[in-house]
Curated annotation (Swiss-Prot):
Gene Ontology biological process terms in this record: arginyl-tRNA aminoacylation
Protein name listed in UniProt: Arginine--tRNA ligase
UniProt-listed Enzyme Commission number(s): 6.1.1.19
Gene expressing this chain: argS
InterPro entries: aa-tRNA-synth_I_CS, Arg-tRNA-ligase, Arg-tRNA-synth_N, Arg-tRNA-synth_N_sf, ArgRS_core, DALR_anticod-bd, Rossmann-like_a/b/a_fold, tRNAsynth_Ia_anticodon-bd
Species this chain originates from: Corynebacterium glutamicum (strain ATCC 13032 / DSM 20300 / JCM 1318 / BCRC 11384 / CCUG 27702 / LMG 3730 / NBRC 12168 / NCIMB 10025 / NRRL B-2784 / 534)
Recorded superkingdom: Bacteria
Length: 550
């Protein structure tokens, strides 16, 4: 019985108790909250349902808790239900009911933890979207890991997810990039406000090698050649780096296509027609303050050029027109103002603003021996996705970026993540999985299987701790999806690995050399198999491998 199963049982019992006393059942919460007590001596689970509804039905909380406890104790799945304090219920599961969690995991396999509670969502998940003017820096790398994991978590919760990369190939930064490449090809200094670094020289050399005539063309033609080839080469490098990192996209959307297709003009006309765009001093302004923004925004400047937000507006419209009812933007720390801006754009176009969500990720700092490794695309000392992977490997890189909330800045200590010790979180979790695989191999050698296991034998405290931790996984996945917080999966994996290691140290899973196989060995092997499956499922959701040997 998982916590969710217990919550359902408690609610059904509460309905019966209230109905039998002719009390109003409509006051019951839609979802009964079940938690693990801080002190294990208080039981397996606790609920405050009696405190929640007692006043609403005109009853003393302890009296209501007493009625509920008596009714619950009569159920075969419940070993005991005791009242604590003003009306809390502390519940212990019967051993057989607790063991049901293990059986459920083994039956569901790779789908354990999945649900369909977000099946109503068609999600456009846009992340990374780094400018094609340089390699992906650490901030973009964080989104590459977190965004991919969030997509996995949303899909595990039933949502349809389209992973999208917005390719910023329209704007002055591309011109600066082209001029930087051209200067490098000519052996000239980097232009003011241009891009520097070895990658600029490498791309420039590749362009000249591919087009020996490049520098002999007319200046405008030369610049256009370096622009087109440079952007294409840089973008191919970005896509290759992301693929090697385990992050792939369904759609690569070119910003320039919004202008070439007339989508920007169409969106502007829609806003003019519905009165949400007005003219002032020769410019056209979005009435964004009417939709929650802190100021109205210029969409078309007085010189007739489109402001940057014009592309954003057209892009919002395009996403909704493709059938997405939830559009998630994962943006950097310097984009906080975009939250109100994008929601206002959606509302002004006639779409539901709640169909736009903006997640803001904070900066990433790389440390070596306690000293910061600086990153600066223009100074040529950029620390990239490739650099991080080369330093600590793909699994450690992804895990280090995912396990913390994106709301806070992140320091990555290279020494910690390079280490093969329990201090390294990803090593600790992966080692747990590898140890479980080793147990399975040894069991096969001994001819021990989990078939026909009597799971009611799992009554040791460490066994109970492990089973209850396993039972929490579906709720963790649900919370990670609902709150858009995949770091919850990583933290859960660490908790599960730790709980397993403590179980392993206290309970002999397989028979010793001089022992015959007993029913407890079979039951513990089943528990180990369920733990292995759940750890593998968690690691999959964060896009990290589950090694069988280490």
């Amino acid at each position: 019985m998982t916590p969710a199963d217990l919550a359902t049982l408690i609610k059904e019992t509460a309905v019966e108790v209230l109905t039998s006393r002719e009390l109003d059942t409509s006051v019951l919460p839609e979802q009964v909250v079940v938690e693990r007590p801080r002190n294990p001596e208080h039981g397996d689970y606790a609920t405050n349902i009696a405190l929640q509804v007692a006043k609403k039905v005109g009853q003393n909380p302890r009296d209501l808790a007493t009625w509920l406890a008596e009714a619950l104790a009569a159920d075969d799945a419940i070993d005991s239900a005791e009242i604590a304090g003003p009306g809390f219920l502390n519940i212990r599961l019967a051993a057989a009911a607790q063991g049901e969690i293990v059986a459920k995991i083994l039956a569901q396999g790779e789908t354990f933890g999945n649900s369909d509670h977000l099946s109503h969502l068609d999600v456009n998940l846009e992340f990374v979207s780094a400018n094609p003017t340089g390699p992906i820096h650490l901030g973009g790398t964080r989104w590459a890991a977190v965004g991919d994991s969030l997509g996995r978590v949303l899909e595990a919760s039933g949502a349809k997810v389209t992973r999208e990369y917005y390719f910023n190939d329209h704007g002055r930064q591309i011109d600066r990039f082209a001029l930087s490449l051209l200067a490098a090809a000519k052996g000239e200094p980097t232009p003011e406000d241009g891009y520097g670094g070895e990658y600029i020289k490498e791309i420039a050399e590749a362009i000249v090698e591919k087009h020996p005539e490049a520098l002999a063309l007319e200046p405008a033609a030369t610049q256009e050649l370096f622009r087109a080839e440079g952007v294409e080469m840089m973008f191919e490098h970005i896509k290759s780096s992301l693929h090697e990192f385990g992050t792939d996209f369904d759609v690569y959307y070119h910003e320039n296509s919004l202008f070439e297709s007339g989508a920007v003009d169409k969106a502007v006309q829609v806003l003019k027609d519905n009165g949400n765009l007005y003219e002032n001093e020769g410019a056209w302004w979005l009435r964004s303050t009417e939709f929650g923004d802190d100021k109205d925004r210029v969409v078309i400047k007085s010189d007739g050029d489109a402001a940057y937000i014009a592309g954003d507006i057209a892009y919002v419209a395009d996403k909704f027109s493709r059938g997405h009812n939830l559009n998630i933007y994962m943006l950097g720390a310097d984009h906080h103002g975009y939250i109100a801006r994008l929601k206002a754009a959606a509302a002004a176009l006639g779409y539901k603003p709640e169909g736009v969500e903006v997640l803001i990720g904070q900066m990433v700092n790389l440390l070596r021996d306690g000293k910061a490794v600086r990153m600066s695309k223009r100074a040529g000392t950029v620390v990239t996705l490739d650099d991080l992977v080369e330093a600590i490997g793909i699994d450690a890189a992804r895990y280090s970026l995912i396990r913390s909330s994106v709301d806070s800045s992140l320091d990555i200590d290279l020494g910690l993540w390079e280490s093969q010790s329990s201090d390294n979180p990803v090593y600790y979790v992966q080692y747990g999985h590898a140890r479980l695989c080793s147990i399975a191999r040894k069991a096969e050698t001994l001819g021990v299987t989990e078939e026909g296991a009597d799971l009611s034998l799992l009554t040791h405290d460490r066994e109970g701790d492990l089973i209850r931790t396993l039972g929490e996984f579906p709720a963790v996945v649900k919370a990670a999806a609902d709150l858009r917080e995949p770091h919850r999966i990583a933290r859960y994996a660490e908790e599960l690995a730790g709980t397993f290691h403590r179980f392993y140290d206290s309970c002999h899973i397989l028979p010793k050399v001089d022992e015959d196989t007993a029913p407890i060995h079979t039951a513990r092997l089943a528990l180990a198999a369920a733990t292995r499956q759940t750890l593998a499922n968690a690691l999959h959701l964060v896009g990290v491998s589950a090694p069988e040997k280490m």
